[in-house]
Amino acid sequence: KIVSRWMGSQNNHQQTHPNHHHHLPPLQHHANNYFPMPLSTYYPPDSSVPLPFPSPAGVNSTQAPFNPSQFCFSHRRKRRILFSQAQIYELERRFRQQKYLSAPEREHLATFIGLTPTQVKIWFQNHRYKTKKSKKESKNSPSSSSMTSSSSASNKVASTTHSPKVSSNGGNGSNTTNNNNKPG
């Protein structure tokens, strides 16, 4: 009964949409939608040698059906850059002084520490996001903020000289003048 209803709806669908050909393979049926211009070669992800790419117009029955997941059209991601401790030290030192850099300042810092201006720009963007996120998390859970800041400070380069100091002498430590001006 269900099959006869389905078959009836299929016949009705074909009568109302005579240009739909459901018996064609997906490549021929949708070739014009996915490939407005014929592609002759593609580069597999792990090769610099082009391989023949099936042309939508010239598909024959001996070829395997087209599987879009087997072809990668996206660009490769660049490798992740690992900064040296000296570079991180300078980036963090400058970030504490200034959260945003102008293009000339960015270029000067990049030249000074041996990075590209784009790398410096991205590092500053990421660091602003991280500090904003950590401040938001510390507002939501004040009891865990002291543990979070102490564990993250131990992972940072030169954290003992640049982390906020909590002391009994009223904050008169040598490096506390910069930190007292910032909202906590």
Swiss-Prot record:
Record Pfam families: Homeodomain (PF00046)
Recorded superkingdom: Eukaryota
Compartment annotation: Nucleus
One GO cellular component term: nucleus
Ranges for region Disordered: 1-29, 129-184
GO biological process, one term: cell differentiation
Tissue expression summary: Expressed in a segmental pattern in the endoderm and in the cephalic nervous system.
Family listed: Belongs to the NK-2 homeobox family.
Name of the protein this chain belongs to: Homeobox protein LOX10
Lineage: Eukaryota, Metazoa, Spiralia, Lophotrochozoa, Annelida
GN (gene name): LOX10
